[in-house]
Amino acid sequence: MTIDAALADKIRRTPKAELHVHIEGTLEPERIFRLAQRNNVKLAYPDVEALRAAYAFTDLQSFLDIYYAGASVLLTEEDFFDMTMDYVKRAAADNVRHAEIFFDPQTHTARGVPMGTVIDGIADALAQARTEYDFSSSMILCFLRHLSEEDALATLEAALPYRDRFVGVGLDSSERGNPPEKFARVFARAKELGLHLVAHAGEEGPPQYVTDALDILKVERIDHGVRAIEDEALVQRLARERVALTVCPLSNQKLMVHPDLRDHPMKRLLDAGVAVTLHSDDPAYFGGYMNANWEASFDALPLDAADAHKLARNSFEAAFLPDVQKAEFLAEVDHFWSATPASPPATANVTTTT
């Protein structure tokens, strides 16, 4: 199927919020090599092309192996600043108006990089981006689920001197064998501190992980969550409680969660009333930032202009923003979709190849 040209133009230009992006996953090969040279870090690949060629993942773990190797070049505040500004420029070009950025401090503190170096480098770039690009943002500290809960608790405590620089906590890394309940205490502690709560669940893990993230960790959003489609009662609950799913289609395709995007459940979830939102996850590794994810989804699935409006709205409704700012963004989205002529439904303007 091929997306209607007018609709393609509109989804590129619509205001969007990005709620599922790992800042370490925005490190392009060129930036990795520049930082390696600056910091005298030896890489296992001779050049940019060889590194890019290594991005042939078969599952989440094979991706994580190279992801952590790439992060090894991040050593100074300047490194984190430069990486973050690279992302902001790409996101702003895709009409991302607000981003809630995941960062993985354990990836860096385990290498001897101070917590403050990580947080200050990212936060300073985001502060500059607000002025230079009118780019709204916040930060979400993620725990690595393949590590222990004790390590997560220590990480949270170490980050508390920088509490004013992040708005929530999340849970990422390898889902298999690391159920949500493993982190019940650290999420309870974060809730006591008034932090927002999100967690990756139902990507490679079963639908039960989505339920457990909601009931045990008390999360407000589910990152990925696509396997919820396997449980009708869970889908109904997500719709009823307006729990947003931060879906990342190109990531799902690259990691073989859904190798063929025509089989992706996002449209079925959206039609069932679930607050689906679209994001890039680790765009440097998965070959696509926000607009690429939107375009691939609309190319593969019978999504139309009404769906696009809904997806854009959902992204801001699910954001951890003050009510006034959220209302302003929603008004901006509604004005965009009402002020420009609506394109016909994508289902009426597609060509299908078999």
Swiss-Prot record:
Substrate binds at D282. Zn(2+) binds at H20, H22, H200, D281. Keywords: Hydrolase, Metal-binding, Nucleotide metabolism, Zinc. Its EC number is 3.5.4.2. The keyword Hydrolase applies. CDD domains: ADA. One of its GO terms (biological process) is adenine catabolic process. One of its GO terms (cellular component) is cytosol. Its cofactor is Zn(2+). It comes from the Bacteria. Binds 1 zinc ion per subunit. The keyword NAD does not apply. It catalyses: adenine + H2O + H(+) = hypoxanthine + NH4(+). It holds the Pfam family A_deaminase. The active site is at E203. InterPro entries: A_deaminase_dom, ADE, Ado/ade_deaminase, Metal_Hydrolase. One of its GO terms (molecular function) is zinc ion binding. The record marks H224 as: Important for catalytic activity. Belongs to the metallo-dependent hydrolases superfamily. Adenosine and AMP deaminases family. Adenine deaminase type 2 subfamily. Catalyzes the hydrolytic deamination of adenine to hypoxanthine. Plays an important role in the purine salvage pathway and in nitrogen catabolism. NCBIfam families: aden_deam, PRK09358.1-6. This is Adenine deaminase. It comes from Cupriavidus metallidurans (strain ATCC 43123 / DSM 2839 / NBRC 102507 / CH34). The lineage of its organism: Bacteria, Pseudomonadati, Pseudomonadota, Betaproteobacteria, Burkholderiales.
